[in-house]
Regions:
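Short N-terminal signal/transit or membrane-insertion segments
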Residues: 20, 24, 32, 98-103, ...
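Bacterial extracytoplasmic/cell-wall-associated proteins, especially those involved in peptidoglycan
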Residues: 59, 123, 136, 140-143, ...
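N-terminal type II signal-anchor transmembrane helix
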Residues: 2-47
Length: 345
């Protein structure tokens, strides 16, 4: 039979052979188009939205089964065929994917193999404490329990990895806007913020070659300056004031370190608050508090490394948020009468 077909083929003219190949190509093209249209086209018009959760180690067959069960694809076999023929059967990435029924088979494969996972964005303002960061993450539903974040922020392995001479990462979680996948773990968030901290720190020349303890002191100072100074231009001056107080063995007398003792900052500290027995009370104790009291931004960190020397020894906040700096205690008391006592009388 085949020999007869071969004889017929040999006797065909070159034009007839060409027509045969053109016809065969057209037939294959239309068959492929029909199969793709019938089996690979989108199921719906986008009204149905589904979150596909792919866990680590999930095989492609389980993923395909979930897609067919939720009516996101037309053919299980065709989807598997495309995965294999395109070499993507082992390239499916873990994550949470937002899919809808307007995506065709090829588009769905592209989404789950390129890692176009569902993301969420959160912003940590400069000067937020770890407690406040946990609150932001909880409100954004990134974490289900603040304790999970605290455990990650106090994880000894992470602290050791980044050479932080403390039992917490307070002060080293860089305040910024972050975009993360929905399934990010607290440990991943903490490490991401730590990496951002050290990346920004590297832009400050004076930070190089410091020991962890020396850096820690700078971050403590920066964290206090961050909470005290609302105006960025005042931060270097304020850093200089605190360093001058340290030099003459005077207490730092920072209200911000006392505010750190409360879960939520008070609008105004009372005299009794300044008498709270705590190593963080810099009215009662000389020197730095045990650790950072906030997570400072780059301007405050820079101010700690590049303080401005001056004759100022005191300061107080004015109604507009700026500070009045004084050289003497007498001048400071006069400013207090002008700005503070009038404000609260």
């Amino acid at each position: 039979m085949f020999s007869e077909i071969w004889k017929i083929w040999k006797n065909l003219s070159i034009w007839k052979k060409l027509i045969f190949f053109i016809g065969l190509f057209v037939l294959v093209f239309f068959m492929s188009f029909f199969v793709d249209y019938a089996l690979g086209r989108a199921v719906g018009d986008g009204k149905f939205v589904y979150e596909l959760h792919i866990q680590p180690g999930t095989g492609y067959k389980k993923v395909v089964k979930e897609l067919i069960e939720n009516k996101l694809i037309r053919s299980e076999l065709y989807f598997q065929f495309l995965l294999k023929i395109t070499g993507n059967s082992n390239k499916i990435k873990q994550g949470i994917y937002t899919l809808n029924d307007s995506l065709n088979t090829a588009q769905i494969i592209n989404v789950i193999t390129t890692g176009k996972v569902k993301t969420i964005t959160f912003t940590i303002p400069e000067g937020y404490t770890n407690r406040q960061i946990a609150e932001v993450l909880l409100n954004k539903k990134i974490i289900s329990d603040k304790k999970n974040f605290f455990d990650a922020a106090e994880n000894p392995e992470i602290i050791k990895k980044y050479n932080i001479p403390a039992n917490t990462t307070e002060g080293y979680l860089f305040p910024e806007t972050y975009t993360i996948p929905y399934n990010y773990k607290p440990e991943q968030i903490v490490e991401m913020m730590l990496k951002r901290f050290f990346k920004n720190l590297a832009t400050i020349e004076e930070s190089k070659n410091l020991t962890p303890s020396e850096l820690h002191e700078k971050i403590i100072l920066a964290s206090i300056v961050e909470r005290e100074a609302k105006k960025k231009e005042e931060q270097p001056i304020m850093a200089g004031v605190f360093l001058k107080r340290l030099k003459i063995k005077m207490p730092l007398e920072s209200c911000a370190t006392v505010q750190y003792l409360f879960d939520k900052p008070k609008s105004r500290l009372l005299e009794k608050d300044l008498e709270i027995a705590s190593p963080y009370n810099t009215y009662l104790n000389k020197g730095y508090p045990p650790g950072p009291i906030s997570n400072p931004g780059l301007p405050a960190i820079t101010a700690a490394f590049r303080p401005v020397e001056s004759d100022y020894l005191f300061f107080l906040v004015k109604p507009d948020g700026s500070h009045y700096f004084s050289k003497t205690h007498t001048e400071h008391l006069e400013a207090k009468k002008k700005y503070i006592d009038v404000l609260y009388e």
